[in-house]
Design a protein with these regions (language model features):
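Shared catalytic-loop signature of beta/alpha-barrel
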Residues: 115, 121, 132-248
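Active-site-adjacent beta->alpha loops and helix N-cap segments on the catalytic face
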Residues: 21-23, 69-87, 106-109, 128-142, ...
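Hydrophobic faces of well-ordered beta-strands that scaffold small-molecule active sites
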Residues: 31-34, 59-63, 95-101, 125-126, ...
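Conserved, mostly hydrophobic/aromatic
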Residues: 2, 15, 61, 100, ...
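Flexible, glycine/charged-enriched surface loops at secondary-structure junctions
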Residues: 18-21, 64, 127-131, 203
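N-terminal capping/lid subdomain adjacent to the active-site entrance of alpha/beta enzymes
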Residues: 1-98, 102-111, 115-119, 239-248
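Short alpha-helical "patches" and their helix-cap loops
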Residues: 16-27, 125, 224-236
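Residue-level marker of alpha-helix boundaries and capping positions
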Residues: 39-40, 78, 104, 127-128, ...
Length: 248
C-alpha cells in the first residue's frame, strides 16, 4: 500500500502516469476474461464466456481446473475432463484459452491434465502443483509444451530468484500487492528479463491491483500477452462495488 501510494504521489506531482515514470507510456492492453468460479457447470461457464466474448470483445479467457489446493481432487468428479473440451468446442479456435489449477495437482496428475490441455489447444496452465513446491512444478514444466505459469503467491525475493534461476515456470506471475508494491515487483521483472521469461502479472479482482498492473504492463520489458481482468461482479466480490467513480 505505501509503495504504490508513493508511486501515485510521484505521478501526481510530476503530472505523469506511473507507466511513464517506469519508462513506458499510456495505451491499450489486451485483456483476458478471468473466471474465478468452480461452482459452475462447464456448459454454463461456456455460455457465460460466449456472452462476454460477443458483448465485450474478449478474445481470451481463463477458467478453473481441479479444486483449490485440492490434492488431486476435482471440484466434483470429472469436471476438469469436461470443462477443457467444452470450452474449446463452445468458444471455437479463435479464442485463446487459459486454465488455473490453484495448486491442485501432484506432478503426475498435472502432466495428465496438461496433455488434455495440449490436445485442446490451451495456451497457459497456471499453478498446477502446490505453489511452494517449486521442484514439483519444474517437473511439469519440463514435461509439457504448454506454458506453465506461477508465482502469484510469492513475496520472498530469494524464492523468486530460485524460481527463475531453476526455470520452474515458463511465465512468471507476480502480484503487485502480494509482493509488496511496484518497487519490489520491478525487482522480479528484472530477474525475469535476465532469464528471458515473460511476465504476466496476477490481478484476480477489480480492486486497485488491476489499475497498478495496467501501468506496469505498459512499462516493462518482457510483458506477457495479457492483462488478467476478472469477470466476476458484486455477487462474487460485493466489496468491489463503488471502489471507483466508474466501475470497470
Amino acid at each position: 500500500g505505501v509503495d504504490t501510494a508513493i508511486w501515485d504521489l510521484r505521478g501526481r506531482l510530476s503530472e505523469k502516469s506511473v507507466a511513464e515514470l517506469l519508462g513506458g507510456s499510456p495505451g491499450s492492453i489486451r485483456a483476458y476474461g478471468s473466471s474465478m468460479r468452480r461452482d459452475i457447470t462447464p456448459y454454463d461457464e461456456a455460455i457465460r464466456l460466449k456472452s462476454l466474448r460477443d458483448s465485450q470483445g474478449f478474445d481470451a479467457f481463463k477458467v478453473r481446473a481441479g479444486a483449490e489446493v485440492g490434492r488431486n481432487q476435482d471440484e466434483w468428479p470429472g469436471r476438469t475432463e469436461e470443462i477443457i473440451p467444452t470450452m474449446r468446442k463452445e468458444l471455437g479456435l479463435d479464442v485463446e484459452l487459459l486454465i488455473d489449477a490453484n495448486s491442485c495437482y501432484s506432478p503426475k496428475r498435472a502432466i495428465e491434465v496438461g496433455h488434455i490441455l495440449e490436445d485442446n489447444n490451451f495456451c497457459h496452465f497456471e499453478e498446477p502443483c502446490p505453489y511452494w513446491e517449486l521442484e514439483q512444478t519444474k517437473i511439469v514444466t519440463d514435461a509439457l509444451k504448454i506454458d506453465v505459469t506461477g508465482g502469484e503467491q510469492d513475496c520472498d525475493l530469494p524464492t523468486w530468484r530460485k524460481m527463475i534461476e531453476m526455470r520452474a515456470v515458463d511465465i512468471v506471475q507476480p502480484d503487485i500487492l502480494y509482493l509488496g508494491g511496484i518497487s519490489r515487483t520491478m525487482r522480479v521483472v528484472e530477474m525475469a528479463n535476465k532469464a528471458d521469461l515473460p511476465v504476466t502479472p496476477h490481478c484476480a479482482n477489480l480492486s486497485l491491483v488491476t489499475v497498478f498492473t495496467m501501468h506496469l504492463l505498459r512499462a516493462i520489458e518482457g510483458a506477457g500477452k495479457y492483462l488478467e481482468f476478472s469477470i466476476e461482479g458484486p455477487e462474487y466480490y460485493p466489496w468491489q462495488t463503488d471502489l471507483f467513480s466508474n466501475d470497470p
